[in-house]
């Protein structure tokens, strides 16, 4: 499986999908890793890691949107 991963953002996208227990949406996380600033993704991931949510992917997307809006306002 790793033979298809040639760039760092792809690796980080796979890492996100595994951490969020959402491997079937790994393409989405690879795209986010390519287009969204890394600090926003890491903050959203740490927020989800500290939570006890059933749907970690949805919580991650919600928090990421909040962080992006806050960044755009400042």
Locate each region found by the language model.
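Long, charged low-complexity interaction segments
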Residues: 1-32, 74
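Alpha-helix initiation and capping sites
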Residues: 25, 37-41
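Short, cationic/aromatic linear interface patches
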Residues: 34, 42-74
């Amino acid at each position: 499986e790793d033979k298809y991963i040639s760039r760092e953002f792809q690796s980080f996208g796979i890492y996100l999908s595994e951490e969020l227990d959402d491997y079937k949406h790994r393409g989405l996380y690879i795209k986010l890793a390519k287009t969204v600033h890394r600090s926003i993704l890491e903050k959203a991931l740490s927020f989800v890691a500290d939570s006890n949510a059933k749907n970690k992917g949805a919580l991650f997307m919600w928090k990421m949107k909040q962080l992006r809006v806050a960044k755009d306002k400042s």
